[in-house]
Amino acid sequence: AVKRHRKSVKKSYVYLSGWMVAALRSEFGPLPDQSMHEKTSVPALIEEIYTFLKQADARELRHLFVDLDEARANGGDVDAALAAIDNFETHVVPIIADIDAGFGNEEATYLLAKKMIEAGACCIQIENQVSDAKQCGHQDGKVTVPHEDFLSKINAVRYAFLELGVENGVIVARTDSLGAGLTQKVPVSQAPGDLADQYNSFLKTESVTDAAKVGHGETTLVRDGEIVKPVRLPNGLYAFKEGSGEDRVVLDCITSLQNGADLLWIETEKPN
């Protein structure tokens, strides 16, 4: 339709978003954007679209070759027919696939990314939410993972591209930190100022002046020589400091680009 309307598909692409696939392509019926649809739904749709675009090419090229045969048989303009074939513009456009938060750990992310690439995707978008607690980007209650977890998934997607011989595959790293006030776990810092330490600096904490008052099973950290206790919710999640979202986004973007991402997606905290 785009090619017929614009006479060209240049600068066009197909984007398969997770919310669209969840709403329209799940065997469970319409679902919210929470990674509850089958993980193979996206690769299946990629293959369907890619096959359809190639079939559109085959159909139009058949007509062009028929025109060439007729020109040769009837003394027509063979050069014009050949030029039409040589200048034919394919219907196939880049396919960008949303892998959500990877549908599992880094190995699961790698396997699913391979399926998407084999089906025809040249670009994969991945986000830093917790896979089994994923929310729609504009909803409250989002939970992010530490950088080490997210970067391992970016690497997993890159390995999938490289294993399939795709040297120029594109990875879009999406950060949901702007609207996320929670994290699933406290990463282990090996040295002051390392990535885990920077991540932990955004945690909402309470000062501990008396170690005897630390409750059973509670977590404590040492920050700048002071013992602090991260604020933990009854569900086990840890809270970030209020107003720290933008700073967390900046750190997310820098670390993603340093570790293999090609493009950045900063998800807004509300649909504005």
Q: What function would you assign to each model-found segment?
A:
Residues 1-272:
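Alpha/beta enzyme core
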